[in-house]
Amino acid sequence: MPKPLAGLRVLELARILAGPWAGQVLADLGADVIKVERKGTGDDTRGWGPPFVEGVDGNHIGSAYFHSANRGKRSIEMDFESEEGRRIVRKLAARSDVLIENFKVGGLAKFGLDYKSLAPECPRLIYCSVTGFGQDGPYAKRAGYDLMAQGMGGVMDLTGMPDGEPTRIGIPMSDIFTGVYSVVGILAALNERQRTGKGCYVDTALVDSTVAVLSNQALNYLVSGKVPKRIGNAHANIVPYQVFPTADGYAIVATGNDNQYVKFCNVLGAAELAQNPEYKDNVGRLKHREVLIGKLSALTARMKRDDLLEKLEAQGVPAGPINDVEQVFNDPQVIHRAMKLDLPSDAARSGSIPGVRTPIIIDGWRAASERPSPRLGEHSAEILREIGEA
């Protein structure tokens, strides 16, 4: 099938992660994404290793980090400091449907490449700015990074054990969510352009996105006025829904209703816990969380993990293992869903560059570009020819 975004032209003036992530998702969906990189050095993340992808000549062709967010793009080197470079970028913008940038607020204005400067000559352009704090407000001028957003957006205070320190989530979630929300905003703006014929400005921010995904914890506070506390691997609103010890490791048990709780107790041979009126519903189980979890944990700790999971599965109780990353990519479900990519590359010593596809399937088509991440300036001559600048 033709890719959903085939024919869409995207100009990416972004580096690091949030902006490039948005560009990669659009590329996976079929857009032609041109990544404009600083002459000589390119995206900073090209050097964020090890590990690096080894090239055919023994030198590396970019860090694993860079390759995680730049699949499917074409790269052109450009010097924004020169008038010639700025002219080329403006020419590329004029033929693009979407522009993504993640400079600090006002950072592109000095080059005449901000939305206000480009809009008159590119009236149909969807211009998306990705920043730490957004285009306005008391923090707008500050630089923003994922770790800061996780902290300032409340996620770190909610993550970790109750008696431990606030904890960063193990992936750059604020960057990634902002990239995904940017794609949502861009697609909404493109739909609006079909109606009006005009482009528009999309403003996304790391802290905004982090606050947005506080989800139930945000509403727990806004409704009750009580500040949520860290509860480790448990759930703020559901009991039992957490990690339990087993005789040989740990298992996740995620009961979502009273019936599943009763089945969990039956698997453990603890009918008395299922019948106890203090635990008959989630309100009671929340009230008596500490005592109940202590009793359940003592029982799960006697069972081997796989035996517990097998019995829970047979009873229809949601449960699962805690996988490390190697186990993730060896998991039969992940393999079946073809999440891992191996993209042919003449530049890589192994002949291919690995990746992880965008998790969208449309009528059986899995969203993924066939093109690996580009070498710095790999497509400069090709792109210049396309705009009559060769």
Regions found by a protein language model. Give the residues of each.
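N-terminal helix-loop segment corresponding to the beta1-alpha1 unit
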Residues: M1-G185, A189-R195, R375, H379-A390
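Glycine-rich beta-alpha junction loops
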Residues: G40, F133-G134, L206-V211, D248-Y250, ...
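Conserved Rossmann-fold dehydrogenase catalytic segment
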Residues: Q135, D163-M173, Q194-T210, K229-A236, ...
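Flexible, small-/acidic-enriched active-site or ligand-binding loops
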Residues: P2, S345-A390
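Oxidoreductase and adenylate-handling cofactor-binding alpha/beta cores
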Residues: G179-G199, A212-S224, C265-E272
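Short Gly/Pro-enriched turn/cap motifs at secondary-structure boundaries
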Residues: D57-G58, F66, I231-A236, Y241-Q242, ...
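Aromatic-enriched alpha-helical interface/lid elements that frame and gate functional surfaces
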Residues: V239-Q315, A319
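Conserved PLP cofactor-binding pocket of PLP-dependent enzymes
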Residues: E313-R337
